[in-house]
Every structure is written in structure tokens, then in C-alpha cells.
């Protein structure tokens, strides 16, 4: 279980009072749970992911994973248990390397190998990883990532992020920069990977349809607080219009 306990975060403000994002925020997320997080800009969604990943430090509070505190664990050490896919398709991959080389690097993540050994992997094994991917990545194993489309790069980032079997996967608006068709293909791939590998997943999104259609649970943040938290039948019966009404009420 991923537990966020009494989390607070403030940023210094040279012109006055500190900018408080969270104050005593607490959320428990079950193992394998796929949680969509929505809310207006500036409400703390990406900040929450940044704190969980170790990119920024919380002001106070605690984060535990499977009853082990990771609050003081360095970011580079958290990468062994926490993977992340960003909104920008150019992040999360090495653009000057081929698809094959990127996958090989991800497969050897955390191993004490030199680069030459890291990049060795059998073609059959790599092709198997790309089976059923609608964006034709299998055909581009020996193409440099910089020549792929945004959707292909984001799909590759997703696959790479899951290869080391992380305990937690953080998705930061990972379909926002894609066209509608490609966005739907990437979210379908996301759901497939999360379900098959049973990864505890937090997905920040502005796409309310995706937030309702995918995932086990929906959380809405507003001014650093949870103003909506639904799952199961309650989530299934929720509509986009009802979410918008709740958002307007929170504002």
C-alpha cells in the first residue's frame, strides 16, 4: 500500500506569505489500484507526483510504501521502485538511441553493467515486448527514437517504465500532448500494462472521459484538498457533467 500521511508542502514567496500547496493531505492507495487524479491548474496534482518521486521535498509529512518509509529516500534510489511518464513525449527516452537500445537500457535498469552490455538483448525478446502495440513500434526497433511520432515515443516510455516492475507508476498528463486518436491508443496501452503487471498507478489527467473510463478510483483535488474520492459503482455511475458541477461547486 502507498500511504501519504499528513503531507504538507509550501513554496517560498519573496513578496509575502509562503505559497501553501498542501496542508496535512492524507491518501491511502491499495496495491495494484489505478487512481485517476483530476483538478484545476495549480491545485497540486503534479506537485504530489513530484513529492512521491522524490523530485522535490515535502515540507512535512510522510510517505510509506508497503509499510516502509520512503520520505527520506533519495530520488535516484526511488527510481528502483517508482517509475514516471511525463507529458512531454521527448522525456523518458534517449532520442539519439534506437528503440532497441532504449528497451535494452530499461531491461537492465539497476544492474551494474557497462553500456555495451546494457545494450545487448535478443531481437525476439524485444519484439515480444512490442507485440500487440497498435503504433507499430515493432517495425522501428532499429530506428532512432528522435524520428518516432509523439504517440510512438510515449508508448515506448510507458513500456520502458514498466519493464523493471516498479511498485508505483506515476503518469503526469501523459496523453495531453497527443492528438485524440493517438491519445486513446496510448491510454488503452496504459490500461493494458497496469492491469497485466498489477502496478499501483496514479494518473494525473485533464481528460475527464479518460478519468471516468479508466482506473479503479477517481480523486479530485482542489486547493490541495481532496474534494471528491469515488470508486467502484459510485465511479461507474458518475458523469462528466456531474464532475464539472462538483468542480464548479469547489471553486
Swiss-Prot record:
Recorded GO MF terms: ATP binding; ATP hydrolysis activity
Record has Glycosyltransferase as a keyword: no
SMART domains (UniProt xref): AAA
Disruption phenotype: C.difficile isolates lacking CDR20291_0805 and CDR20291_0806 show reduced uptake of tyrosine. Production of the tyrosine catabolic end product p-cresol is decreased by sixfold, and the intermediate fermentation product (4-hydroxyphenyl)acetate is not detectable at all.
Stretches of the chain forming a coiled coil according to its record: none
Main location: membrane
SUPFAM superfamilies: P-loop containing nucleoside triphosphate hydrolases (SSF52540)
Cellular compartments annotated: Cell membrane
GO CC aspect terms: plasma membrane
Assigned EC number: 7.4.2.13
Originating organism: Clostridioides difficile (strain R20291)
Topology of the protein relative to the lipid bilayer: Peripheral membrane protein
Family, as annotated: Belongs to the ABC transporter superfamily.
Protein name: Tyrosine transport ATP-binding protein
A single BP term in Gene Ontology: amino acid transport
Catalytic reaction list: L-tyrosine(out) + ATP + H2O = L-tyrosine(in) + ADP + phosphate + H(+)
UniProt binding sites for ATP: 39-46
